[in-house]
Every structure is written in structure tokens, then in C-alpha cells.
């Protein structure tokens, strides 16, 4: 069982001393005495960072992308995790422009490329201290980092019917014991309740092991319940693409209509059918209707609940289906349609082409580095909440729940 984050997102044994450092929400990293507090500009979103030269070669990159962040994991949390390395320069958690909520990923800058590489090799897929059921998810934050970036293929499976106590680590070890090519595992968590949704994903680097696992592990117990295994969208080793659960951090278009449960799917391969689309998206909840307009390279998936549509948007944006990378956004809200016929609703929202939907390309973590100026965050992000905007919600009071990241 995993604990909910303490109030304010501060780890239980990381409470800061009553001093001037508190104005930055500083935490003593891992109980190391004498660690210097972070500079003010690191924690003030409005502060302008000093300009610096953007790296031009792989050996100059000193920034890591970090994903799978919980809504309460802020810059203070990242500092508490990595400042003990002695070479952390700054951190930035990406937030939604409208709500100010954490989008699930961020960036950490180190003093040198070598320092960043040591952290990447040491912490990637390692348990987070004080939260051992959650794993660090790290990668290089630049497309130019060449073969040092993990662009190997990902072959992913869906794992359903998980018990409430199954965490990322438990799921990972369940499969790693039999399949050496397992690269990672993710149990999907409901952001509202903090509880597992009862399903997750496991990534392999070997396609033959993925295929074997789909047969051999179906019905095998994980914790107290037998698992239900199925196919999931996979990354085929193309630079800049992201795996099925890592894409949860992608910045898809926000929809504020509580009644809209429809997802637009762009860039479909011609071989993908309505049934194929339904099988992939049904992993995220009950589906009301699926439609791929004749002759079009896009489709629509309507869920019974908005939360299911949100999860599908987070998980599937930018993955491969049928040989192409799909792009997801919100479809037209049912409250805006003029006809009660579902088929008319879908066709009516299609317009003159995929661009009419205004869907966004999946925001690969590396794409942000084009605007990231090495020593600060003055370019490209545009994620800082506007003045007068409500701050992110505080995490709930500490309690015991079935949790994993």
C-alpha cells in the first residue's frame, strides 16, 4: 500500500527548518546537513533566468527530462530528490496554462553533461526514496543527444484486472523475472482518488518476449489476482516518439466541457478499422461509439465518461497504431451538435480536413529543449500560469490508499 503525499508535497523527513529558506519551500535533500538552498529564481515561475548558450552537440547536453510526475510533485520535490548529487543547477515542472496543474513531466539541469549522465544511469527506473512503489522516469532532454537517447523499439502489453496493491515496481518485477528485455512498467492511477485504476502497461525491447508474455502471463497471479493481458500501442524505435504510458505527459488540447467524452484520432493508418480502434481505446473505459469516416485518415472514439476519454488522451497521444503515429485531441462536444444521430455527430465534426480539429502534435519531452536555454527557462516553455490564475490544488491529507504512480 502506498501513502498519499503529505500536505504541501513535502516528504515526511524533509521538513525544512524554520528559517528564511522557507520562503522557497526548500527541503533538506535526503537529510543531508548543510546543503545550500536553491536560488530564488528556481522556485519563482515569474523570475527571468539569465540567458545562456543552447547546447549544439550531444556532449554539451546537461538537462534531463523527468516524467511520470504526480500532481503534487513540484520543483521543491525534484530538488529534494537530486540536490544531494551536488551538481543540480535548476528544475522546472511543466504546468497546464489554464489550470496551473502539473502536466506530469519536467526538466532538471545539472552543472555538466557528465553529472547529468551519472544521474540518468543511477536513477532511471530506480525507486523514489520515501516512495519506493514509484520509479524515476528519466531521459535526455534533447533530440540532438544522438544514440545516447533511448530510441530503441518498445513493444508494450496491456495488463488488466490488477489488484489494488499492485505498484509499478511489483508489476515490473513480476514480468522481469521471466523476460529479461522488460524495460519498464506503469500502473495507471486515478488523479482524483489517488487509487489504481486496475490496469497498467509493461514495455519490452524484444518483440518475441512481448508476444510470449501475452500468452504465458495471461491469467498468472500478480499479488492476489490473475492478470488479463492484451495488446497495446507500441513505439517502433522512431526518434522522438514515445511509449504508450510515457505519452501521458503529452500536452493535448484542453476541453472544459464536462459533457464532452469524444476523442479525435488523427494520422490513422489505412489498415486500421473501427474494431481495431475500439479494441485499443476500450482499455481505458466503456466506449459508446467508434467511427472512422470512409476515405479519411482519422477517427472518433466516444466514451461513456469524460475521465476515460482524458486517460486515453494522456496515454495514447503519439503512439503507433498500424504503422503510423496517431495524434489525439478532443472531438466535438455532444452538447454542440445539432443532430441526435451519432454518425451525424462524427461526420459533422470532421470539416475540411484533420487540421480543422486543431489537434496538437504530441509534445515529445525533447521538443521543449529547443526553447530551453541551458541555464534557465526563458524560452519555449510558455507553461507558467498567468497572473491572477488560481494556484494548483494542494494534495490531500496523508492517508493509506492503493497507490502506485
UniProtKB/Swiss-Prot annotation:
Q: Name one GO molecular function term.
A: RNA binding
Q: Which domain of life is it from?
A: Eukaryota
Its Gene Ontology biological processes? mRNA processing; response to ozone
Which keywords annotate this record? mRNA processing, Nucleus, Repeat, RNA-binding, Stress response
Compartments annotated for it: namely: Nucleus
The UniProt record lists the RRM domain at 62-143, 155-234, 261-333
- Gene Ontology CC terms: extracellular region; nucleus
This entry's comment on induction and repression of expression is:
By both biotic and abiotic stresses (e.g. ozone, oxidative chemicals and pathogens such as virulent and avirulent Pseudomonas syringae).
The job of this chain, per UniProt, is described as: Heterogeneous nuclear ribonucleoprotein (hnRNP)-protein binding the poly(A) tail of mRNA and probably involved in some steps of pre-mRNA maturation.
Q: Oligomeric state and partners?
A: Both isoform 1 and isoform 2 interact with poly(A)+ RNA in nucleus.
What name is this protein filed under? Polyadenylate-binding protein RBP45B
